[in-house]
Design a protein with these regions (language model features):
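Long amphipathic alpha-helical coiled-coil segments
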Residues: 48-63, 173
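Extended low-complexity, polyampholyte segments enriched in Ser/Thr/Pro and acidic residues
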Residues: 67-197
Length: 197
């Protein structure tokens, strides 16, 4: 993955002066590198908290690239900032347990719409693949659909990562706190032996 990033940088595949429509069709797939880095690193269980934090950083990288091309809708940008607890300046805000719960309890209508949208994208991708896998690199509709379905996956993954980080933080806090919940029973005083006269 890092080799691909070096190639992207050296060949200047992406530019701040471009719009999304200016990106070559065969280069759209390179926009997904940071996304797949996040997906891959999430599979590691050692140093789990660090792994999850890196996963969020890769999603940030993916989001920032999309933003630089103004690819995302205002609603998507707003949703991302809400999920990552960031204000308009991009600074991390303190979150409450209620916010974490709300992430997992999305509006039912939104979930249904997201499911339908994801299903339509998946069907479109499969249809294009069936028609001719050898011409996929030239098919702009395919790569845009592929990009969009992975944006949805990112939105689905972030709340899960946040919840897992919260759980790890809670466990760490419990371990560090002194065990003062249960007061120790005072030892009974020993009776002094009376000295014989």
């Amino acid at each position: 993955m890092n080799d691909i990033k070096v190639k992207i940088y050296k060949e200047k595949i992406f530019s701040d002066n471009e719009e999304f429509k200016d990106i070559k069709t065969e280069d759209i797939k390179f926009m997904l590198v940071a996304f797949y880095q996040s997906e891959l690193i999430q599979k590691f269980m050692v140093n789990r908290k660090n792994v999850l934090e890196f996963a969020l950083k890769f999603y940030d990288e993916f989001f920032n690239l999309l933003q630089s091309y103004e690819y995302l809708s205002k609603e998507q940008v707003k949703k991302y900032k809400k999920l990552t607890h960031k204000d308009e300046e991009g600074e991390k805000q303190k979150k409450t347990p209620q916010q974490s719960f709300e992430e997992m309890s999305q509006n039912r209508t939104e979930k249904i719409e997201m499911y339908k949208y994801k299903k339509n994208l998946s069907e479109k991708i499969k249809k294009i693949e069936k028609e001719g896998i050898d011409k996929i690199d030239e098919n702009r509709e395919y790569w845009i659909s592929y990009l969009n379905i992975n944006i949805v996956k990112m939105f689905e993954s972030i709340p899960m990562i946040n919840m897992e980080i919260d759980a790890i933080n809670h466990m760490e806090k419990m371990k560090k706190e002194p065990q003062q919940q249960m007061p120790k029973n005072p030892e009974p005083k020993k009776k002094k032996k009376k000295s014989k006269a």
